[in-house]
Amino acid sequence: PDLRNSKSIDLMNFLNKKHHIYFYDPFVKKLEGFKNLIEFKSSKFDAVILSVPHTNIIRNLKNKFEPLLKENCIFFDIKGSLRSKKIKNYWSL
């Protein structure tokens, strides 16, 4: 499954009302109303929400995604896929 087949879109629409939202899903290149993280060329993120834990994302977390996070970034892991990892400011359901 990808983010289009989950409640992720509802969450993104809600957050997009007051915040700048970027998405990343290895199976989705374009999503109307949102910018793909691949287009991101600015400063770092205040928060990250992992809603669909693709193997590719988890495998590349340190190398590809961690450099995009601010020092005190909050990392929300909706499904708790990374509970066993040591992640600063980690939050899960």
Residue spans for each PLM region:
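Structural/interface elements that position substrates and couple domains in central-metabolism enzymes
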Residues: 1-93
